[in-house]
Structures are given as structure tokens and as C-alpha cells.
């Protein structure tokens, strides 16, 4: 299973990647914003799960989610948003855009595990 982690913070990408490795997800790609993520997705069509931050330069996570959902080949791709935007309105906006699950930073490894298992069924 291949995952793509998108966050402008290299520290947060490392935390998520290390957490995923402990959960036995070893095939993890990284991108620092939505523009780079879109390029990574174009070059690696076998990405199974997208984990993205919301607030990033260039193309933010919400814009990335909308772009991903506009492509038929990604319509069923599980997407988890990991962000500091924890208000009810933000969660609703993200879910309407196509996010499958939502994690508010800071979070524990157990939360990431639970949300990932949830989107994977």
C-alpha cells in the first residue's frame, strides 16, 4: 500500500511518516504542498491513500482535495486531512470537498491509526 503525505512542515511529515512506519506502512511518499503533491500523483499513479494538511503555500490541502476529487481515477481514493483547523465549519467544508476523515493537530499515533483503518474499511 502506497501513501502520500502532504504537509509544508518537514517535521510534521516526518512524524506522520514515522507513525505510519510503526503501523507497518513503509511505502510513503512526501510532498510539501499541493502543487508538488499533484506532480507526485501524476508520476506515481499507484497511490492508495492521501494524507494532507489544509494550510500550505502554493496549493492548499482543500484545493488539492477538490482537484483530486475532480479526477475520475481518484474518486474512491481515501483522503485524510490532518490540520490545525478544528472548527465545526472547517470540518464540514473539508468533508463536502471530499475528505473521508479528519484529524486535528496535535494528534496521537492511535488517532492516526484509527482514522486510517476507518478509511480503509
Regions found by a protein language model. Give the residues of each.
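Receiver (REC) domain active-site loop signature in two-component systems and cognate sites
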Residues: 56
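Two-component/phosphorelay signaling modules centered on CheY-like receiver
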Residues: 10-29
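Active-site T/S-Asp motif of two-component receiver
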Residues: 51-53
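C-terminal output helix
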Residues: 107-116
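Acidic, metal-coordinating helix/loop segments flanking the phosphotransfer/catalytic sites
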Residues: 30-49
Amino acid at each position: 500500500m502506497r501513501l502520500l503525505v502532504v504537509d509544508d512542515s518537514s517535521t510534521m511529515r516526518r512524524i506522520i511518516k514515522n507513525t505510519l512506519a510503526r503501523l507497518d506502512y513503509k511505502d510513503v511518499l512526501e510532498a510539501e504542498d499541493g502543487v508538488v503533491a499533484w506532480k507526485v500523483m501524476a508520476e506515481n499513479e499507484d497511490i492508495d491513500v492521501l494524507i494532507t494538511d489544509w494550510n500550505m503555500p502554493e496549493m492548499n490541502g482543500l484545493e488539492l482535495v477538490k482537484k483530486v476529487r475532480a479526477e475520475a481515477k481518484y474518486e474512491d481514493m481515501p483522503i485524510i486531512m490532518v490540520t490545525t483547523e478544528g472548527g465545526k465549519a472547517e470540518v464540514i467544508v473539508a468533508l463536502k470537498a471530499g475528505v473521508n476523515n479528519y484529524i486535528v493537530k496535535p494528534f496521537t499515533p492511535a488517532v492516526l491509526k484509527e482514522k486510517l483503518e476507518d478509511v480503509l474499511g
